[in-house]
Amino acid sequence: MHIERLDFENSPYLGVYGFATDRVAVIREGLGEKKLATLREVLKVPLIETSVMKSRIVGIFVAGNSNALIVPWYIWDAELDFINAQLREYGIDMEVVPFQSRLTAFGNLILANDKGALVSKDFTREEARKIEDILGVPVERGVIADYTAVGSVGVVTNKGGLVHPEATDEELEWLSDLFKVDVYVGTANMGVPFVGSCMIANSYGVVVGHLTTGPEIVKIEEALGFLG
């Protein structure tokens, strides 16, 4: 099973509440065991259930790739300690970096895989260079379909990418070159263009909001490399 519909307390915006890499997934607290089991089965990585500043919208705040996770500088010490302890328990050697910036919604503002990263043009060039050092991949600043919240309007793994349907052909070519995967346009949750907010994905699988239609699922499967 590489794709599954799911809701988090009737919300179809799964990407707001979680984030996944090919090594670990960070998920909001308070989900039932049945949904956690589905996440484990689909994403095939350990789950860390946590909060950021006691907020459950951890997908808004956390970004990264297989090399590192970036979290807001104001994350509580207890939360940071818990994430690091969980990584150690799972035997995962991954840095978790509280990043100093006036921007904090990193899940909305950073789109990354293990080949490259796109960060919002709202980051300074110096911040982009620091993010490049943390994630260990080339970083570019920019927008997708005129949106600065590149993590909200896109999802990318090491197998493929899906972005806002208004992205241009030139943007798709640029993103494919940056991430070294094919990137398509599409929607989720019955026409929502903010695909990054609608799903949690890695190279092993993807969980999508429960409102996502059959045709949307086919497109998501194609874009993220699960067909053929």
From Swiss-Prot:
The keyword Oxidoreductase does not apply. It holds the Pfam family eIF-6. Keywords: Initiation factor, Protein biosynthesis. GO terms for molecular function: ribosome binding; translation initiation factor activity. It comes from the Archaea. The keyword Glycosyltransferase does not apply. One of its GO terms (biological process) is cytosolic ribosome assembly. CDD domains: IF6 (cd00527). Belongs to the eIF-6 family. PANTHER family: TRANSLATION INITIATION FACTOR 6. NCBIfam families: eIF-6 (TIGR00323), PRK04046.1-5 (NF003129). Binds to the 50S ribosomal subunit and prevents its association with the 30S ribosomal subunit to form the 70S initiation complex. This is Translation initiation factor 6. It comes from Thermococcus gammatolerans (strain DSM 15229 / JCM 11827 / EJ3).
